[in-house]
Amino acid sequence: MMGVMFSWILVAMHTHTSPSRARMDDDCVDVPAAPDYDPTVCFSLSNLSALPKQCIAPTWSLDPPCPKCWTNDAPEYVPGTSPTTLTNELKAALQSQLPEYLDLMQRQRPPSHADDGTIFSGIGARALLYLKLHEATGDPKFLAQANPYVDAMAAKIESQKLDDRATGATGFQWSHIGMSCVAALAADRAGDAAKAGQYVQDVRAAFTNGDGTYDDFDSGGAGLLYAARFLDENLAPSGKPYIPRPLVYGLASRIISRGSATATAAGHPGVMQWHGPNDDGLWLGQSHGVAGVVQQLLEVPELLENATALGFLRRTLDWVVSQQFASGNFPTEYYNATEDVLVQWDHGAPGVAAALLAGWRAFGQASYRASAERALECVWERGLLLKGLMNCHGIGGNIWMQLYAAKLTGDLKYRYRALAFLGTVLSTGLLSNLTQMRQPQPLPNAPWGFWTGSIESSIELWTDLLYRGPANASMTGWEARL
């Protein structure tokens, strides 16, 4: 598997080609392989003079011979010696860069900018970032800065609902559901319980009026399950769940039922994600795949009391483990199960490791943790991605997954590794200096997205690391806490 070679060109999302069919890398499709090109081999940041010019700014090509990742030269973890908290140097660098990133976002993406309103790629992301800054720092200026973004986002909710009815989207990231959650949170923080309740009703309606076309995290039912957790975690306690538990359990049960149908059709266990059962894209990762669906189902305690659902989830995770490469990575999709390429939150080892650790926490199954640990070794080796700092398919997401692994396992090695990645980023102008780094523009689907843009993803990560610390950092939009 390590010898498989690929080449890449930038294309829009959702494109399918033949015979080389698009992979959900959000920006890549297979083309004929270049000689001696191996996407599993990383390139040393200390030898940039040897890197072809098209591989760095301003072109930032992802085509061969450009590598997928930078070589990780950080030393291995030594218990009791390696740092697992922010050093003074890292803290100073974050304190310097966070205001620069915020200033750039304000100037290039003001509330009046003609973006969509979603959390994934639009104005809602900026509203959420300022609300997070307010929550983490207690500084009222951030709440004031959030308000224009919240207002601009709220003005787009009704039009987004129309789009969602046409597409069947109900996920927190890609639909009006996330926008309504953020608007409810802003109203809650402003002390307007009635207004917050109106937006909560928007979310509740998705549970009662049908849960859409998809089951994946980004656009479907798994993301809707997350929305219920987000409201309960972040809004003022109301004495009862904001989304009634029978509605949450009902949605989770329907996802299990659809997953069972997909398993029968595909001939293997699997919780269905994005496309219908006859589609050939059975994805494995967090965005549109099995990992993202299982991750959210495991957060529904009522489901774990159902023997049928419990058995199905365990069979699904057992099957996922069976798909792991010798490298520790996982395929992007079932029907291209020999492609050991992507090592990022949405596809590959990082996101799948998180789901396996959640399964280990729920079931105590040692094989799930062992598989996750092999996957995290792959992240350590190949997780300094050329694409940038974004959450979805960049270094940021891989830092978050290592912090998550540290929280679930208690193994400080993963927190050290997250901070080692951070140290590499902050000490390398090519990765973090705004005049040198790879900007998000080359990505065609969401140049300034909360998940697909280096600037906004970094603002979220820098905020938590500075003001909450690595042990308490929470990947908003995936973990429930703001």
Regions found by a protein language model. Name each.
Residues D25-E100, F230, N234, E299, ...:
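Terminal, non-catalytic domain-edge segments
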Residues M2, F6-D30:
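N-terminal signal peptide
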Residues D27-A152, P246-P269:
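Low-complexity, Ser/Thr/Pro/Gly-enriched N-terminal "stalk/linker" regions
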